[in-house]
Amino acid sequence: MSAKPTAALVVVSAFIGLFAAGAAAAPALTELVSLRSNGKQGNGISGRVSAPAVSADGVVVAFDSEATNLVGGDTNGALDVFVRDRATGRTERVSVSSKGKQGNSGSSGPAVSGDGRFVAFSSGAINLVVGDTNGRNDIFVHDRLTGVTTRVSVAADGTQGDNNSIGTAAISGDGRFVAFTSDASNLVPQPASGRHIYVKDRLTGAIERVSVDSAGNPALGFVAASPAISGDGRLVAFASSASNLVADDTNGTTDVFVHDRVTGTTVRASVDSAGAQSNDVSFRPDLNGDGRFVVFDSAASNLVPGDTNGVPDVFVHDLLTGATERVSVDSAGGEANGQSVGPGIRGGSAFGARISGDGRLVAFDSIATNLVSGDTNTCGPFYNDIAGECPDVFVHDRLTGETVRVSVDSAGAQANDASTDPDISADGSTIGFFSAASNLVAGDTNTCPVFPNPGHCPDIFVHVR
């Protein structure tokens, strides 16, 4: 049985009512965002290795792209990170130095602050900041207001990491705190082998390891990954195969944990409503704004009663009450007939489900055909040509129980190819996602290597509810 949340965690997580009011109703709209400022479509895959990131109000969308025509002067031949401002229609490249110089290696894994000003990303480039001589992948933050790019995967005294810092980072609402995954052994004074999760305070320069138990001992083993951070930066969720982070961790598989940076307490979130541990792997967490609700993917069959579909599902654990619920269900609560998580575009996000700021809405993708009526779309041959088993993006409302499909065009017509890897704005209004479909917006005709059919070059879209 996992440890219960501390009183301090309960206090910081409590809010008035179980759910905040939902986002105001608005006409449904699906929009292509991986465009040049003049509206020209990209000539390469967007969302090549990472999910899009959406600001709190859904206006700013960050994404990676292989396209060379989204901005002028893109000649590095590498994956870059871009930001699209949906209000102004401007697209800019943010994986650049403080002088605007393009990176000399690939960049990916964007995360954005609540107001869209700060963008964290991962890069192998060595020319984004002065003194980058470690020859390793690092985590950077670009300030879109000042143009300044800083490296955050460094020790408190500025010493650069002795190994790679990788994957998609997580950034607090105000952009001050950045959580990231690193193999480096010299970011904090206490050495530890393997891969760990760290949090950098961009205001003070302090850095701490958070993949630790409640006594501060580091996770044992190689894997700690997929950080998520609460809006104020206090709580950090992550996945780890370590068995020493909480008492009685005997399931021998990867679990999801939450560390409270104020109290030092670490709890396991991938448990059932009675606190019993899962019987299979759990991974890819996300946190709502105050950190009360943890969404995660799991192949476990014992987290909720009646889980008999034999495929991975999406769950939400309430750190205040201890309740765990399955959210990859239809509007009547029926379980999915296909997996809702997976290793990639063939039926599951490589980056996991996402939860709105108030914890009410969860965005996820699934190959299930029974989550909504009329799910009969077929993917292109590159992905999956079985009718219905084409991954789509869904949103489940935990207050009303309703599940809707959002990887549709503005009139509600289903996509003609795969859609995966969602992010949802904190206000719940906007869902960003990756799609190879050509029919979500009019005039989607771009092509790229591997995807020669017009319009089926993967792009980043948003659906406004």
PLM region descriptions:
Residues L9-F19:
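Bacterial N-terminal signal peptides
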